[in-house]
Amino acid sequence: MFQVVKRDGELDEFKMGKITAAIDKAFDAKGKNYSSDMIDLLGLRVTADFQNKIENNRISVEDIQDSVENVLIQAGYSDVAKAYILYR
């Protein structure tokens, strides 16, 4: 797997659960109904979206967050994307 470069420069192992948890919280913030399968699918789409941004087996947390926003908007959840932006 690859590593995530955090804002403070520290490295952390990539964990899909962090992406899906953040998406889950954004849906909750908007009071939207969702299934865990849908959240998992959105998480997979996020990882596909940022694949080309991985360099030397590393990606920045900002690039991941940008991909979450892009995927939510593309999936028709612009209101959830706004909640995610506020959450991050």
Per-region residue spans from a language model:
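Long, C-terminal-biased catalytic regions of enzyme "large/alpha" subunits
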Residues: 1-88
